[in-house]
Amino acid sequence: MTRHLKACTAKKDSAATASNKRRTRQTGIFHLVIEGRFQSAYWLHLNIRSDSMLRDLDHFLRAIWLECCGHMSAFRIEEKTYLSQLFQDTSFGWGPERQEYKMDTKLGKVLRPGMKFFYEYDFGTTTELSLRVLSYREGQMEERIRLMARNEPPPIVCEKCGAKADLVCAECIWAKGAWLCKRCAKNHEHDEMLLPVVNSPRVGQCGYTG
């Protein structure tokens, strides 16, 4: 997938440069791969401009994969933490030994090719992501973030009958019998906790419905 996307990107860049040479300025572009930190079946390939802020990436991840109740979030890049909202009490979260900053920081100032960093959404029922900077290039891109590829929904079967799972119980998700088809879900004891099976590493958590 990575090799294919690099080849396609090179072709598009060449075509864009030829047709838009006088209209669009060159900008730095990072190629990011984002995965569920403990659920690698869920992944995204993105192109993102280096003049974008961490907040832009935060908003994108919330929109495509995560947002349910307006929870807080954070990027962890090397020894620094970038929070969607800073706390007055610096002993919260990672403790006073970790430097905390706002997300109004440009990617070009904190990322470099080969770097791996992390993201967390919701500090209660936390969804964790790992991010890798595959490459950096100069090119033309009008939008700040471009989705290049994402995973197909992983096959998940009903734990009762083996059919395709449609629902997951947020109460039972770390136990047996959480993944259910619609028919088997009718007899589940926690029917009020059932959530739709969606293509996201946040599936089955908090109130996330996709």
Residue locations for each model-derived region?
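Short linear regulatory motifs enriched in tryptophan with gly/pro/ser
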Residues: 1-210
